[in-house]
Amino acid sequence: MDAAFTAEQDEIRRTLREILGRRCGPDEVKAAVRTAGGYDRELWQQLSRQLGLPGIAVAEDYGGVGCGPADLALACEETGRVLLPSPLLATAALCVPLITALGTGAQRSALLPSLASGGMTAALAVPGPALATALALTGGDAAGQWSGGGRAGGVQARADEAGGGWRLYGEAAQVLDGHSAELLLVAAHAGGFARSRTLLFLVREGAPGLVRSRQAVLDETRPQARVQLRDVPAELLGEQGAGGEGADVLAALAATGRTASAVLAAEAVGAAGEALARTVEYVRRREQFGRAIGSFQAVKHRLADVYVQVQAARSAAYYAAWDPDQGGLALAQALEALRTAAGEAIQLHGGIGFTWEHDAHLYFKRAASDELLFGPVHRLRAHAADRAGLFAPAAAAAAAPARPVSPAAAVAAPPPAHEKVAV
């Protein structure tokens, strides 16, 4: 494995850092989240035209740059540093891979060029707070119960016998950038109890019966929406077989979850590194008892511990960008590093770190919000351990039937003469 970045990757990171340094300062971030869309549309168009940011992982045949998830992860590390509010994650990391994997040739040709150019944004709508489950980040759900599972709730899909196509009814909450996206990918349950399955549908902006509202959230730089579908016409993503079965949506969602977790890990590492850098800069300038507080040994040790944790998380994130199968574990480590770095930033900034005007709380809110959306950390680690089979021998031994024990063997043998017996 060659861990060195290519010249093109270094250039993308350098250019992106320069643009964000000029256009995405703390004041610009706070102004962007207060707009109707929740992000700076002019900056989004600049990043799309100059760097092709939304199309980094889109094939060149569809107007993209033709790079892979690793390049998208490196770009998101830079956007995470400044907590850039943008539809990049929802569009490029969640929706583009699903359209590429499941869409028909006509659907890919119609949608991917617009998404790659930044002219269209997309959002993945999953019923309830089940995004981590749908993406198989915290455990699989072979039955797709999170989408409705034949019970009340979720989003239900029925075939429109009269006009063809499909109709959707239900509600999805915590949809990333769902209030501003021109295209929604809606996960819905179809087939009732007998032929239960989860399918993905395309819903256009302005479709009759579609009601979207922006939610009040903990992290304003990660806008979310509630999407209500009231008999909304929809188009099935992909083709439906003769038996009524669609593509393997759950497998495609799980594959998307693996690459998205690597991207999220890089983004969280970027935020953690910036929170640490700002804290180090502050303790060098802040004086107490006639000297900089950064010269105190206790402060040095705390920041050194954070530095080690952030660097370890960065290494894990880079490895996951190369091997997305390790994305869940890298995401757990990155979220933990961000939470620690943001918490120490607030503590070491002292009283000013608790104020609304300072930026420290934004990084802490990003840490808490991402863990609520994509975690929690202990479940990410548990699922990674299950996938690696770490506890398979123990589970097999526990499931094995007990062997009968003879009465003679049940009596404990006396200890050897040389062995001491504890009383």
Annotate each predicted stretch with a short phrase:
Residues 1-80, 118, 255-423:
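Alpha-helical interface subdomain recognition
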Residues 48-121, 177-181:
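Internal helix-loop-helix
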Residues 101-103, 127, 186-189, 201-205, ...:
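Short beta-strand-to-turn element immediately C-terminal to the catalytic PLP-Schiff-base lysine
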Residues 118-134:
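A short, Trp-centered hydrophobic/proline-enriched beta-strand micro-motif
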Residues 120, 151-153, 179-182, 196-197, ...:
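A generic structural signal for well-ordered coil/turn residues at beta-strand boundaries
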Residues 125, 165, 171-210:
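A short core secondary-structure module
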Residues 137-145, 174-177, 204-238, 243-244:
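Flexible, small-/acidic-enriched active-site or ligand-binding loops
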Residues 149-169:
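Cytochrome P450 C-terminal beta-domain/meander region
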